[in-house]
């Protein structure tokens, strides 16, 4: 029927950072070690950073952008970054850190808008849109404007949105407040 997808349909992609507290997240890993009475928290690299999003923020981001999508684009939220050393200090202020080295395949910083995609990346107030690299037939391929009519601005060539150069970082104090409110739930 007409309400089914075909090979000609282009769906959007939603790209976002580490979901706080999810499986594989460092938060439950650190908490388990703290609860076991470890004498130092293992840190793979003292400069490591990550983007940070809650599960609810991730769900809201996807739902909020359904009305903006044209199809084929990648939506990327603007998120705060966290230094892994700050997170460790927030969770266990009195525990030292032990640098253990980066594991195979692990990245020092997270990249959500690569520089190679800057020629088709648009910045909006709270998010970025990376337009598709292929042209879909019979579609409005101007991704500087969302389907909802919001206008974005093309980023400068070479622009990269990564967790290291992000201007928005959580402080240790903010991380402690987040952790305390999570414990209170």
Residue ranges and their predicted role:
Residues 1-9:
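Single conserved hydrophobic/aromatic residue that forms the stacking wall/gate
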Residues 13-18, 29-53, 57, 61-80, ...:
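A conserved pocket-lining segment of Rossmann-fold NAD(P)-dependent short-chain dehydrogenase/reductase
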Residues 124-156:
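C-terminal, low-complexity/hydrophilic appendages and adjacent surface loops
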Residues 10-13, 155:
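Gly-rich Lys/Arg/Thr-decorated short loops/hinges at beta-loop-alpha junctions or inter-strand turns
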Residues 152-185:
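Generic C-terminus detector
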Residues 65-136, 173-185:
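Mid/C-terminal beta-alpha module of Rossmann-like enzyme folds, strongest
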């Amino acid at each position: 029927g007409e309400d089914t997808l075909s090979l000609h349909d282009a769906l959007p992609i939603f790209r976002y950072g580490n979901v706080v507290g999810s499986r594989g997240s460092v938060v439950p890993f650190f908490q388990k070690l703290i609860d076991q009475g470890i004498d130092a928290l293992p840190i793979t690299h003292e400069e490591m950073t990550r983007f940070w999003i809650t599960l609810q923020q991730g769900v809201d981001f996807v739902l909020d952008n359904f009305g903006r999508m044209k199809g084929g684009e990648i939506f990327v939220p603007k998120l705060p970054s966290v230094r892994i050393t700050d997170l460790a200090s927030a969770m266990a202020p009195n525990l030292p850190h032990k640098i253990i080295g980066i594991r195979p395949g692990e990245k020092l910083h997270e990249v959500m808008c690569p520089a190679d995609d800057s020629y088709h990346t648009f910045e909006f107030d709270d998010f970025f849109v990376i337009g598709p690299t292929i042209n879909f037939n019979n579609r409005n391929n101007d991704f500087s404007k969302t389907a909802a009519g919001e206008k974005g601005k093309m980023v400068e060539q070479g622009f990269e949105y990564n967790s290291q150069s992000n201007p928005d970082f959580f402080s240790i104090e903010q991380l402690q407040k987040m952790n305390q409110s999570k414990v209170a739930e």
